[in-house]
């Protein structure tokens, strides 16, 4: 049911010193976690940044395949706009799968020629092929493994054609995005390291900030 309600939790700090808001998406490979698992993190960000944050409890795979979570995110932005929050004052943020969802939403708005304030991606999932050098080096020695990432992507993917969609495979982006700024954090001993670096390089080469 496309009209089914989804949870969007608001965090309001003791003091707000800007008119922007952050729309946050939690990580967990699109299969795990919720707004509740990331509650402390988002509350901390809100207080330290003195910024209102809305955290979205998007629908998880495998019951909800691509692009269900993206459609939830689009719905959340429409709700914020109905509350007189301009898209140009919205920063999209997320960790891992949440970073992928934030970037996917940026790509969606780029295709609609709609500007957003920024995107802030923490060790984002970017490439469903999972075959970068960092996947080979760090893919079986640390917390997140190459096999786990393949499992997450498999549960998210609906059809083979998804692999040709820039909102599924972020590395297919071939145009300047409409986010004013992009911030990307990578982790050193992480299978996702190289794909996030490559995504950053692609954006830089297309004159993104």
Regions found by a protein language model. Name each.
Residues 2-209:
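Alpha/beta-hydrolase superfamily serine-hydrolase fold, recognizing
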């Amino acid at each position: 049911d496309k009209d089914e309600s989804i949870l969007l939790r608001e965090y309001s700090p003791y003091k707000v010193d800007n008119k922007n808001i952050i729309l946050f998406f939690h990580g967990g490979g699109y299969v795990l976690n919720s707004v509740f698992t990331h509650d402390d993190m988002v509350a901390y960000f809100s207080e330290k940044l003195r910024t209102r944050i809305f955290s979205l409890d998007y629908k998880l795979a495998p019951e909800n395949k691509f692009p269900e979570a993206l459609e939830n995110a689009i719905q959340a932005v429409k709700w914020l706009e109905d509350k007189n929050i301009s898209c140009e004052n919205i920063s999209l943020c997320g960790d891992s799968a949440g970073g992928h969802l934030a970037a996917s939403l940026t790509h969606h708005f780029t295709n609609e020629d709609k500007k957003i304030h920024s995107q802030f991606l923490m060790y984002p999932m970017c490439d469903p092929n999972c075959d970068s050098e960092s996947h080979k080096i760090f893919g079986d020695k640390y917390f997140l493994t190459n096999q786990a990432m393949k499992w997450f992507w498999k549960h998210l993917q609906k059809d083979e054609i998804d692999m040709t969609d820039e909102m599924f495979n972020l590395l297919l982006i071939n145009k300047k995005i409409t986010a004013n700024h992009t911030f990307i954090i990578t982790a050193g001993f992480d299978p996702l390291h190289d794909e996030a670096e490559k995504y950053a390089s692609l954006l830089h080469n297309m004159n993104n900030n």
